[in-house]
Amino acid sequence: MSEKIQKNVFGEPLEPCSSDPLTGWFRDGCCNTDKNDQGVHTVCAKVSDEFLQWSKKVGNDLITPHPEFGFPGLKDGDSWCVCATWYARAIEEGAACQVYLKRTNVKTLELIPIEKLKKFALDLS
């Protein structure tokens, strides 16, 4: 990972997403990314039961723990860095959960327009 502080969708320093459960491509609590992150784990989502059930149904089980990968399994209300491509699909299929834009990496905007993200934002004033 680059030592450089990554930016959020507003061009500001990226804020931490979650330390419990510990999230992020680097398991550093932030939705940081690099060229090796093919899933682009950059959207800080507050997962809902609906989103988790949809995700499991379409092939990405985020509920079942996998301790061998440092994955605790998620429950309603957890914050987690989800894949931008996966979140874009959730929007299109009506299963998107809420997101924290100040905790969402600017890289997300390469895949999801800011206007779509704002519809699900928890942290707009």
Q: Which residues make up each language-model segment?
A:
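Short, compositionally biased
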Residues: 87-110
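Extended boundary segments
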Residues: 1-50, 121-123
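Short alpha-helix capping/helix-loop boundary micro-motifs
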Residues: 63-70
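Glycine- and charge-enriched low-complexity intrinsically disordered segments
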Residues: 106-125
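Short, basic/aromatic beta-hairpin or loop at an interaction surface
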Residues: 46-61
